[in-house]
UniProtKB/Swiss-Prot annotation:
Residues in the signal sequence: none
Keywords: 4Fe-4S, Cell membrane, Iron, Iron-sulfur, Membrane, Metal-binding, NAD, Quinone, Repeat, Translocase, Ubiquinone
GO biological process: one example: aerobic respiration
Catalytic activity as recorded in UniProt: a quinone + NADH + 5 H(+)(in) = a quinol + NAD(+) + 4 H(+)(out)
Enzyme nomenclature, EC number: 7.1.1.-
Organism encoding this protein: Buchnera aphidicola subsp. Baizongia pistaciae (strain Bp)
Disulfide pairings: none
Protein name (database record): NADH-quinone oxidoreductase subunit I
Localization terms from the record: Cell membrane
Binding site for [4Fe-4S] cluster 1: C60, C63, C66, C109
4Fe-4S ferredoxin-type domain boundaries: 51-80, 90-119
Amino acid sequence: MILFKFFLACFSQIKSVWLTFINIFSKRETRMYPEESLSLSSRYRGRIILSRNSFGKERCVACGLCSVVCPVSCISLKKSTLKNNKWYPKFFRINLSRCIFCGLCEEACPTLAIQLISDVELSEYKRQDLVYEKDDLLISGQGKYLDYDFYKFSGVEVGTKNKGELDFESHPIDVKTLLP
């Protein structure tokens, strides 16, 4: 019995050395990140930004939907009103140390102001540096969604066209015709 355990231990050692020897010549799985670029998925959700419209004005109307839908409550903002009765965020703050990058804020935003881009370098030395203010989040461009203006489409009358006559609308359904 002792001799059997001895041969089993020797076989285990030889097998370990053999596996190590074989894997020396195989392709390395680890990537050296800064030198080798990462290939990210097209649906990757990274850093959060606030975008502007095509006229250079910020898109955010401070509706608060992003703050409400966030499961970890990492978004806080305060609404203020301009002279022309349009809302804007007086402050907009995201705590990225709490953010789970789920993308629900991007889906809830009616103006497409908040967007998640494919930036992976988000590390900081202090936790306080992971709290981003509006000036840190606001970019000069339009982000992923070009030529979209919320005020151009919301609440604008089409003119003489009835509901369902435009090419991007479907005709309204009369629910009385669906009854048995």
